[in-house]
Amino acid sequence: KDRWVRFFYLLSERIYQQAFRVTSLFTDARRIQIELGCAAEKCRVIPNGVQYERFCEIPLKPEDGWVDIGAVVRLAPIKDVKTLLYAFFELSARRERVRLHILGGVDDEDYARECYQLAEQLHLKHLRFPGRVDVAEYLKRLDFTVLTSISEGQPLSVLESMAARRPCVTTEVGCCRELLDGAPK
């Protein structure tokens, strides 16, 4: 592993010297590029975008006595769906009328199977795995969204949730703090 890390740093140094411009998705990624040896004047930030018009008009979910939580994630280890399932287990023990919707495809069949088995072991009766869906359409059913990833850049699911006026709870990865709290000055 150390060999690969050294190779990465060496490669980064050479590429940064040759690069005309280095573009990052968020402020902290730019800072890391500079720490790795890129000249600050070469670095810029161009964040992801979403079609705001597609999400801003989505109505809030009508009050029905249930709290509906959505996670727009692929079933892959990096999305840490197991932690989400354990958290939902804890929440379900404290609150009766809560549902979790895990929206997204399967990237890793073995991991998906482990998630389904864990959900069964935890007896999560108000859990849904609808698979890939039209997120803009499905957001109508959700009160808020959650992201438990262990690594991210600038997650589109958070941007889409915010555009649809849905609160979002995230792990502190990528630029989630920057999205939720605002970019540092």
Task: Go through the PLM ranges and name each one.
Residues 167-170:
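Short hydrophobic beta-strand element within catalytic cores of glycosyltransferases
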Residues 71, 76-90, 110-113:
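A conserved mid-protein helix/loop that constitutes part of the nucleotide-sugar donor-binding site
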Residues 113-132:
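Nucleotide-activated donor-binding/catalytic signature segment of Leloir-type glycosyltransferases, i.e.
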Residues 28, 49:
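Carbohydrate-associated surface elements
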Residues 173-185:
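Short acidic/histidine- and often glycine-rich active-site loop of Leloir-type glycosyltransferases
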Residues 1-23:
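A conserved, positively charged/aromatic
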Residues 50, 72, 99-113:
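Glycosyltransferase donor-sugar binding loop
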Residues 150:
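Aromatic "clamp/platform" in nucleotide-sugar-dependent glycosyltransferases that forms part
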